[in-house]
């Protein structure tokens, strides 16, 4: 009787561990867990890098990128995210594991601005770099998005110039000073070494 109970308990433990591992592999659940933990100010994240070893993150990133109409533009190395496969993802993961992954140089194109004869720079990454960047973006957003101030509108999900203007319209109470200025090609002319 004891023998069968022990076998049953061992079986349940193995099944439980497998279920926990599978749940941890689900990127949506991992991201939700990171979001919940980020609400605790005293919590310190550790081993976030290991999420880059999870193939399911790359498939979710692929799904996010593929929905974008410009995602099939080839990078400087000629690759796109088209033709994604488990083998390609495993190669990326292995290069992450042995720390040999290096981003490829980006390709810079100049595209015309709407209703203007001026052009703006557009940086196009290689397919693998787009994928890795999307995975990192998902992880960082899940950690930092819950703790950002409601007044921050730049480069955030569901935030834009329009949401900033709407907030100003609803909450603006007046000011003593306005400063008007024009920053020409701000990001292009900034010293990136100083910023970083």
Task: State what each model feature region is.
Residues 1-196:
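Non-catalytic terminal/accessory segments
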């Amino acid at each position: 009787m004891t023998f069968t109970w022990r076998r049953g308990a061992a079986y349940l433990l193995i099944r439980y561990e497998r279920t926990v591992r599978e749940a941890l592999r689900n990127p949506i659940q991992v991201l939700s867990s990171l979001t919940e933990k980020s609400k605790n100010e005293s919590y310190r994240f550790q081993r976030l890098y290991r999420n880059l070893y999870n193939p399911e993150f790359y498939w979710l990133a692929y799904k996010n990128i593929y929905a974008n109409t410009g995602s099939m533009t080839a990078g400087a190395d000629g690759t796109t995210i088209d033709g994604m496969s488990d083998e390609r993802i495993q190669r990326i993961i292995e290069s992450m594991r042995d720390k040999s992954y290096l981003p490829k140089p980006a390709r810079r194109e100049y595209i015309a601005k709407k209703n203007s004869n001026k052009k703006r720079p557009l940086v196009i990454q290689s397919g693998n770099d787009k994928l890795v960047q999307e995975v990192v973006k998902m992880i960082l957003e899940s950690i930092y998005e819950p703790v950002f101030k409601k007044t921050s509108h730049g480069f955030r999900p569901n935030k834009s110039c329009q949401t900033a203007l709407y907030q100003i319209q609803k909450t603006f109470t007046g000011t003593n000073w306005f400063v008007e200025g024009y920053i020409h090609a701000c990001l292009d002319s900034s010293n990136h070494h100083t910023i970083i």
